[in-house]
């Protein structure tokens, strides 16, 4: 009987521990989800909508610039650099999930043409490896090797992210052709404002959910506020919860309207997207162009020599 009770107690403890770990995981995931492009993997099959909008913008509401640099043309089965630039003021600090201020991280999603993919380590030159640093890239999906994600990574070190890309070879991949292709990029700096479930993070403005008089502002022990709003017309009370890390714009006794901002906007980051074009060049076409240019140069040389020879003949005839 005692053994049975012991096993029952052990089973309950294991179940309780698993439940606690699961809750910690859910809370932690909720606090960071949708903060960087890499988390879009968990919610969207494709990061680029039919309208051309990259889904990271659903959670990063502020618009910021992003730029991409790629070669104008590449040869098949060669490795090239795609450099994504995510500029921002390095002196800025953002509100973290715990309410404290910290440095901004960055992330990016790179949408390549079908057939283009992350270059294998043995094809990357030492010079390119030095530019890449300690970055670790991932495929957006196992079956989508042409879509790469990175982040979050420290923005002060990686405001420029170098992707090593392997160009496809139409000789071995019949779905690839020698054409001009588009490349799309999305990049963000800082945390998002909206979580995937639609709830707000503590990196955005909180507005009043009702109009009336602010009856009470309670500062919570672990940070944040409870703001009690009383509707003067019907004495109905509404409590708005403000998470930690935000600065209040209102005070007790103040009259406010529906949707009036209760806090300042703490967001200093944002998301941007851009595009570029790259040509997968046929080596035979390049050779043909070089042959043509060589022929033109030779023709010009022969023309000059012929002209000089003609001038010499004319000069000798005049002397004769």
Curated annotation (Swiss-Prot):
Residues that, per the record, bind heme: 36, 56, 59-60
Required cofactor(s): heme
Keywords: Chloroplast, Electron transport, Heme, Iron, Membrane, Metal-binding, Photosynthesis, Plastid, Signal, Thylakoid, Transmembrane, Transmembrane helix, Transport
Residue ranges that the Swiss-Prot or TrEMBL entry lists as coiled coil: none
Cofactor note: Binds 1 heme group covalently.
Origin superkingdom: Eukaryota
Record-annotated membrane-spanning stretches: 286-306
Secretion signal, residue range per the UniProt entry: 1-35
GO molecular function: electron transfer activity; heme binding; iron ion binding
A biological process term (GO) from this entry: photosynthesis
Subcellular location: Plastid, Chloroplast thylakoid membrane
A Pfam match: Apocytochr_F_N
Primary location group: plastid
GO cellular component: chloroplast thylakoid membrane
Topology of this chain in the membrane: Single-pass membrane protein
Role noted for this protein: Component of the cytochrome b6-f complex, which mediates electron transfer between photosystem II (PSII) and photosystem I (PSI), cyclic electron flow around PSI, and state transitions.
Family that this chain belongs to: Belongs to the cytochrome f family.
Subunit structure: The 4 large subunits of the cytochrome b6-f complex are cytochrome b6, subunit IV (17 kDa polypeptide, petD), cytochrome f and the Rieske protein, while the 4 small subunits are PetG, PetL, PetM and PetN. The complex functions as a dimer.
Name of the protein this chain belongs to: Cytochrome f
Organism: Lobularia maritima (Sweet alyssum)
């Amino acid at each position: 009987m005692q053994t049975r009770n012991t096993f029952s107690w052990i089973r309950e403890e294991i179940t309780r521990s698993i439940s606690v770990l699961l809750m910690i995981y859910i809370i932690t995931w909720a606090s960071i989800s949708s903060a960087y492009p890499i988390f879009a993997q968990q919610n969207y099959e494709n990061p680029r909508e039919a309208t051309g909008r990259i889904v990271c913008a659903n959670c990063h509401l502020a618009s910021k610039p992003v730029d991409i640099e790629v070669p104008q043309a590449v040869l098949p089965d060669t490795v090239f650099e795609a450099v994504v630039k995510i500029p921002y003021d390095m002196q800025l600090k953002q509100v973290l999930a715990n309410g404290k201020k910290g440095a901004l991280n960055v992330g990016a999603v790179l949408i390549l043409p079908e057939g283009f993919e992350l270059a294998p380590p043995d094809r990357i030159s030492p010079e390119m490896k030095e530019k890449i640093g300690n970055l670790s890239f991932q495929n957006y999906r196992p079956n989508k090797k042409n879509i790469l994600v990175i982040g979050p990574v420290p923005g002060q070190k990686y405001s420029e992210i170098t992707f090593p890309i392997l160009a496809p070879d139409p000789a071995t991949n019949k779905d690839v052709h020698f054409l001009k292709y588009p490349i799309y990029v999305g990049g963000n700096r800082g945390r998002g404002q909206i979580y995937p479930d639609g709830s707000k993070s503590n990196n955005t403005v909180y507005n009043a959910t009702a109009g009336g008089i602010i009856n009470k502002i309670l500062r919570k022990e672990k940070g944040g506020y409870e703001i009690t709003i009383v509707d003067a017309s019907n004495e109905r009370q509404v409590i708005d919860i403000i998470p930690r890390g935000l600065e209040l714009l209102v005070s007790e006794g103040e009259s406010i309207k529906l949707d009036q901002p209760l806090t300042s906007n703490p967001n200093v980051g944002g998301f941007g997207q851009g595009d570029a074009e790259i040509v997968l060049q046929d080596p035979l076409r390049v050779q043909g162009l070089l042959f043509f240019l060589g022929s033109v140069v030779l023709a010009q040389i022969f023309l000059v020599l012929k002209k000089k020879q003609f001038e010499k003949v004319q000069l000798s005839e005049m002397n004769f």
